[in-house]
């Protein structure tokens, strides 16, 4: 893969998309490793933190489907600016949170706003990528967001664990999101089809669900949509478990420091960022189906080992291997999902559905993982292994039907 001839340098729209995603990922991720610690500092128990993070995910899931319709109506760029604008207020709001209840409400609203931004983000990406290098394009898009997130999470964790200053991290997050909004407003183009579609808005809106049902019935896209939804669910389920519970697991089970747990979350994002383009490129070369299968094998093997290993050095090596497997799985997922961008009559519904599944995984994960953690702290990664195996079995059942037809 020649970097100089890479699609990110040959397609301007994709470059601008990647810049804004890096900026947003960097800014937003100041909060990711410190939110559980922030809630804990307010006196919330692990179980309550899990429930709050679950409601955050519920809010994110509930807003995605309707936001897909809104994105079609007002344009993805405008919806992205509005959602980012509201999100920029969230980190700043934590500095005024005078009670546990207020902090929890802010976090739940934050989840709903993330859900609003998701369909618009997918829509902008689907019209910014190179059709001939779809996997590579989505790989770079994922990479810049998670690379920015890795750096942001590391800085946020350092500020809190070493300086003990939550407010400073929240201020930086808000300012960074505002800068992302400015870039989106200046550099991201409006969708070209907006005016043409508005002439038949009633017809398109009224037939969207009907078109999806018809597509499922006659073109057999349902297995692919269900499979993509299941994989998206798994990805955010495991990510949500690690973000919400690992800060406690690392200290209480592995005997590591709080800063180590922040580093692991940052490494999670860093691995995604560095290897997502490779994963996207390889999914173009070997095919999505084969890459999904190999990724599941790596993930399941790693989770099996992580379920009983307690030594920090070996644990760190194996969890990085797991991160690699998850990265390649996500790259294949994004490659397959964004092919629905060629189906304008159903793309927003499909993006919204898969995004809602992803958010549902994040919603369920904290409450499930906190329950398992309270039951037995050592069961955490065993539970993640069982979850991954269930989705892997779903893949084995559906993959023939899911990949039997082409979208374009």
Per-segment meaning from a language model:
Residues 1-11, 191-228:
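Juxtamembrane intracellular "pre-TM" segments in multi-pass secondary transporters
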Residues 34-47, 244-259:
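Short amphipathic helix-loop junctions that connect adjacent transmembrane helices
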Residues 57-65, 149-150, 269-277, 359-363:
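Residue-level signature of mid-helix packing/kink "hotspots" within the transmembrane helices
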Residues 64-75, 276-287, 373:
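Helix-to-loop junctions at the C-terminal end of transmembrane segments
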Residues 78-92, 290-305:
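Structural signature of the two symmetry-related core transmembrane helices
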Residues 108-145:
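Cytoplasmic helix-loop-helix junction between adjacent transmembrane helices
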Residues 116-129, 328-342:
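Intracellular juxtamembrane helix-capping segments at the cytosolic ends
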Residues 168-185, 381-396:
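Symmetry-related core transmembrane helices of the 12-TM Major Facilitator Superfamily/SLC fold
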């Amino acid at each position: 893969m020649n970097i100089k001839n890479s699609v990110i340098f040959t397609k301007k729209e994709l470059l601008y998309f990647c810049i804004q995603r890096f900026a947003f990922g960097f800014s937003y991720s100041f909060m990711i490793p410190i939110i559980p610690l922030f809630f804990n500092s307010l006196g919330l128990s692990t179980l309550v933190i899990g429930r709050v993070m679950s409601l955050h995910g519920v809010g994110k899931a509930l807003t995605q489907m309707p936001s897909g319709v809104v994105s079609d109506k007002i344009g993805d760029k405008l919806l992205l600016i509005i959602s980012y604008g509201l999100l920029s207020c969230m980190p700043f709001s934590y500095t005024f949170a005078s009670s546990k209840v207020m902090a929890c409400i802010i976090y739940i609203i934050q989840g709903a706003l993330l859900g609003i931004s998701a369909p618009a983000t997918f829509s902008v990406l689907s019209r910014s990528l190179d059709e001939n290098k779809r996997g590579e394009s989505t790989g770079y898009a994922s990479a810049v967001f998670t690379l920015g997130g890795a750096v942001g999470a590391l800085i946020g964790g350092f500020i809190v664990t070493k300086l003990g200053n939550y407010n400073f991290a929240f201020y930086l997050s808000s300012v960074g999101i505002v800068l992302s909004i400015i870039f989106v407003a200046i550099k991201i183009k409006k969708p070209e089809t907006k005016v043409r579609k508005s002439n038949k808005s009633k017809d398109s809106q009224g037939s969207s669900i009907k078109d999806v049902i018809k597509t499922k019935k006659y073109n057999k896209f349902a297995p692919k949509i269900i499979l993509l939804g299941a994989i998206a669910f798994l990805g955010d389920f495991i990510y949500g478990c690690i973000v919400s519970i690992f800060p406690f697991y690392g200290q209480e089970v592995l005997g590591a420091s709080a800063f180590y747990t922040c580093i692991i979350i940052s490494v999670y994002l860093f691995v995604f960022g560095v290897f997502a383009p490779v994963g996207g490129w390889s999914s173009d070369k070997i095919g999505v189906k084969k890459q999904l299968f190999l990724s599941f094998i790596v993930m399941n093997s790693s989770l099996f080992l992580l379920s009983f290993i307690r030594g920090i050095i070996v644990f760190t090596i194996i969890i990085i291997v797991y991160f690699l497997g998850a990265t390649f799985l996500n790259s294949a997922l994004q490659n397959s999902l964004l092919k629905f961008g060629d189906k304008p009559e159903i793309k927003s519904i499909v993006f919204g559905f898969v995004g809602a599944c992803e958010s549902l995984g994040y919603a369920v994960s904290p409450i499930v993982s906190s329950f398992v953690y309270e039951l037995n702290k050592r069961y955490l990664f065993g539970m993640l292994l069982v979850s991954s195996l269930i989705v892997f079995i779903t893949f084995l059942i559906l993959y023939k039907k899911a990949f039997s037809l082409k979208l374009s």
